Regions:
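N-terminal nucleophile
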Residues: 1-153
């Protein structure tokens, strides 16, 4: 593992309802640099920190140019049902976006982009949450979806 890249993760959730995930942004190697900061800490920084969703993403956006391309999705689920989810991409848009309720998809481009695999995943996810009646089945089905390697063209 390269120095400065250890200890990171791409997805995480805490028992208090905080969660985060990051993806790299798919781009030509000519637009990346080996001198960029590692992105692995982006998820754990949110999970370990005290900032709310929007403030955390604003802080990350202030340093966005120091990294190769990435998406960062962070959120908080509260016991009263209020959910706050935000997204930031350091390549396109470069604005912190607070998400409205609904199903959103994220891969290696922008949020809700129109890649075939995104449409496929969104439809599968919607069907799973509509048709699943127990927590165990929901978890099993969602894990199966994450493992799905079906080629969609």
């Amino acid at each position: 593992m390269k120095s400065g890249r250890e200890g990171g993760t791409w997805i995480g959730m805490k028992s208090d309802g905080k969660f985060a995930a990051t993806t790299f942004y798919r781009q030509s190697k000519k637009f990346t640099t080996s001198k960029a900061k590692g992105r692995g800490h982006l998820v754990s920084d949110f999970l370990k920190g005290d900032d709310d969703v929007e403030n955390h993403l604003k802080k990350v956006s202030n340093e966005g140019d120091l990294y190769n391309g990435f998406n960062l999705l962070v959120g908080e689920l509260s016991p009263n049902g209020e959910t706050k989810v935000g997204w930031y991409c350091n390549i396109e848009d470069k604005q912190v976006t607070m998400l409205k309720p609904g199903i959103h998809v994220l891969s290696n481009k922008t949020l809700n982009c129109s890649w075939p695999k995104m449409g496929y995943g969104k439809k599968r996810f919607a069907r799973i949450i509509e048709e699943t009646s127990t927590k165990k089945d929901l978890v099993d089905e969602l894990l199966w979806l994450l493992k799905d390697r079906k080629s969609v063209v």
